Each structure stands twice: as C-alpha cells, then as structure tokens.
Design a protein with these regions (language model features):
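A conserved helix-loop-beta module that forms one wall/lid of the active-site cleft
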Residues: 1-31
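Short acidic/polar capping segments at secondary-structure boundaries
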Residues: 4, 19-23, 34-35, 54-56, ...
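Coil-to-beta-strand transition motifs
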Residues: 56-58, 67-72, 154-159
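Short beta-strand scaffold segments in enzyme catalytic cores
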Residues: 60-63, 150
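ATP-dependent carboxylate/phosphate-activation module, predominantly the ATP-grasp catalytic core
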Residues: 63-133, 165-174
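Conserved metal-phosphate-binding beta-hairpin within the catalytic cores
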Residues: 131-171
Length: 174
C-alpha cells in the first residue's frame, strides 16, 4: 500500500501504525486529513507509519527459507481475530451510525486459513521476491530462516503486503 510522509498528501482512508510489534495496539484508522489531525493528538507514539488502508481479508503467510538448499517453503497461513474491528464489521453501516466507537486492533487469537488454490502461486512468488530483494539489500544470504508476510487480499484478488516480520508470528501452531 501507499505510504504517506506528509499528511497533506492523504487523499483516502489510512491506518497509522507504530514501529515494532505491539500486539495489535498502537494503531488507528483515519478517514481523511481532518480525522488524522484529530486522532494524532491522542496517539502515544512519536514514530509511526501512515499507510493507505486496504479493504480486504487479512492473511498471514509463514515461510521458511534455507540458503543451504536455496528453497522457500510455506509453513502455514492464518488470519488474526482482532477486537473490536472484527465485531464492528458484523454491524451494518446504518447500525454503526451515531456510535462513538473507534476501531481497535488488539489481537485476541488466530484462525488457520486455507488460501484459494489460484492464489498460491502469487503467495509463493511474493515470498521468493522478499528473499531475492533481501539478498540484494543485505548481500550474501539475505533473509533466511522463518519470516511472515502480513497481507491483505482485495475483492479482485490482488495481494498487498502490509508488513514483513523476520519471524513466525503468533498465529501458527508450529
């Protein structure tokens, strides 16, 4: 997704995230510039990323890359269950109007997810591109061992990486 360095460039909904793992805390959604300016005043982090908010299904793909065999494996996939954003999604828009509830993204659990077969080649290719790019950026072996691509899949089945974790994230049963 597009990232914004200047709030004046914000033209559509964004999510603002602190750096580092925070268990789903340290996020807020803003509809536009005015909403951002209002919410940033209460935000507790001085360092943050402003990222285009992509509407779709979240997916966490856990990979393992071995520089010895030069092979990448998909170990598992899952989806986070977050309060209160997941329960808000079950309330029709007209039922949300007038509620003074800001979405929160505190992780309460993960559910295994089986990705549609037609999307598997792209999921593998994305992992391979991350490894190849890391080799160019870091030299030598680049990224190796476990890592996770945190993605959003849109209704037209486009896959966007929203974060890269250099580890297996909490949702796997490995």
């Amino acid at each position: 997704p597009r990232q914004f360095d200047d709030i004046e460039d914000i033209t559509y909904p964004v999510i603002v995230k602190t750096y580092g793992a925070a268990g789903g805390k340290g996020y807020f959604y803003a509809r536009d510039k005015a909403d951002f300016k209002k919410k940033i005043k209460a935000f507790k982090s001085e360092q943050y990323v402003i990222q285009e908010y992509i509407i779709g299904v979240t997916l966490y793909v856990h990979y393992f890359y071995s520089p010895i065999t030069n092979e990448i494996e998909v170990l598992s996939m899952d989806r986070r269950y977050e309060t209160n954003v997941d329960s808000l999604g079950r309330i029709p828009l007209h039922g949300q109007q007038g509620l003074d509830i800001n979405p929160s993204y505190v992780v309460v659990g993960n559910q295994p997810l089986i990705l549609r077969e037609s999307l598997l080649p792209e999921a593998f290719a994305m992992g391979e591109r991350v490894v190849e790019t890391s080799k160019k950026l870091m030299g030598g072996k680049g990224l190796f061992g476990p890592f996770c691509l945190e993605m959003v899949i849109t209704p037209d089945q486009r896959m966007f990486v929203i974060e890269i974790s250099g580890r297996i994230v909490a949702g796997t049963s490995l």
